[in-house]
Amino acid sequence: MFSNQYIQQRIHKANSLREEGKNPYQNGLKRSLTNAAFLEKYAYVKDLEEPKDKEKCESIVGRVKLLRLMGKACFIKVEDESAILQAYVSQNELNDEFKSLKKHLEVGDIVLVKGFPFATKTGELSVHALEFHILSKTIVPLPEKFHGLSDIELRYRQRYLDLIVNPGVKDVFKKRSLIVSSVRKFFEMEGFLEVETPMMHPIPGGANARPFITYHNALEVERYLRIAPELYLKRLIVGGFEAVFEINRNFRNEGMDHSHNPEFTMIEFYWAYHTYEDLIELSKRLFDYLLKTLNLPSKIIYNDMEVDFNQTSVISYLDALETIGGISKDILEKEDRLLAYLLEQGIKVEPNLTYGKLLAEAFDHFVEHQLINPTFVTQYPIEISPLARRNDSNPNIADRFELFIAGKEIANGFSELNDPLDQLERFKNQVAEKEKGDEEAQYMDEDYVWALAHGMPPTAGQGIGIDRLVMLLTGAKSIKDVILFPAMRPVKNDFNIESGE
């Protein structure tokens, strides 16, 4: 693992520090303020007639980003999370310690510098070192910069390197944290209660997806990593909670691309005595709040597309297929004509697809990518909405919507099905689809049906993909850019263990 000659040289320097009686991995030394606080607190020094203040003494810490040796002195750029600060170290103050520093210090090492503020001849506020300590010796040299396709792969595999070398990456994840905390605050202000539900399920439910399977040794049963928290959250509505939300991970054992990761973050929320129309209005308020909190304009650029949040629209599923997808009503209203049309367009259609799934194929290919401004698509086919309430006027459609922005689904919501007998029949239909080979069809969940039988009030529920939301609001082109440690194809190391190296 550490056979590289440059690594060996650094290991030798770490051992040399030990021989001098110094621990290359010290603990207990503390800074007095951050680099950013130092730069703010001592900005006045640059305006002094003699630009230094020897009466003040501070300790700063960070990683060495640049090292410039000049005989009996050196300049060091030290970076902590807040800022980069220059340190000046000279032999006059440190004597033998300076010789040790020149011998052992390298870019990448983590250090503590104690000294007073002063400004250089070029006017750069710096710390004049009176003490210098190596807190952590870096034995693997840092890359100067990332470039090229292979290095993009390395950035995702070794995110710690990405964070060290590319300062902008930290900004993305700080903004992600702000987005998540803002979403949480919004729902708390709206009167929702945050809850936690199981991550391991006896039956995978709440979405049409292929689950990950694990085994519970103590119970001697298989368990499924959750694909959605929906059915547990609705059990809470049955139990008497009227507005709940959960922000957590879901796991789906499916493909990966620029907008899909098998482990992803979602918020799901359920609101008793409300409808899916209420959720549409709530979603509009949420985006208004996020744009304001993040100081973003109503028009943002994402992947060279202008998204205007002032141009939000609502359109039915069939109207979208006709007016946006360009498919005539004559074709849309007949299953055999729709199938023939899809085949004529060169779309590979799996055998035995239901009419609703044929409509979904058409929507995915001809409509979704054209929905740039926020668009709420409503009145979904009931066949692809097994948990949604059936529309009172038309039993073939569901009281459901999906929100699309910049050509991608961002949210899915509906008025919840609370008729236990109807839900039982829907589950039976899903089981029949699974027996025909549909691996993503839902399982029968009798316990959930039994819960519904105890009475669930009229309820609306919605899910929003946090990762895609962050992509949209940060301009990230890949979901891997907004997940700290995204799923990657395995690479084996010398010990045949999966590695990021």
Curated annotation (Swiss-Prot):
Keywords: Aminoacyl-tRNA synthetase, ATP-binding, Cytoplasm, Ligase, Magnesium, Metal-binding, Nucleotide-binding, Protein biosynthesis
GO biological process terms held by the UniProt record: lysyl-tRNA aminoacylation
Any Pfam family: tRNA_anti-codon
UniProt-recorded Gene Ontology molecular function terms: ATP binding; lysine-tRNA ligase activity; magnesium ion binding; tRNA binding
Enzyme Commission no: 6.1.1.6
Gene Ontology annotations for the cellular component aspect, listed alphabetically: cytosol
Source taxon at top rank: Bacteria
InterPro entries in alphabetical order: Aa-tRNA-synt_II, aa-tRNA-synth_II, aa-tRNA-synth_II/BPL/LPL, Lys-tRNA-ligase_II, Lys-tRNA-ligase_II_N, Lys-tRNA-synth_II_C, NA-bd_OB-fold, NA-bd_OB_tRNA
Catalytic reactions of this protein: tRNA(Lys) + L-lysine + ATP = L-lysyl-tRNA(Lys) + AMP + diphosphate
The protein's name in its UniProt record: Lysine--tRNA ligase
Organism in which the protein naturally occurs: Helicobacter pylori (strain HPAG1)
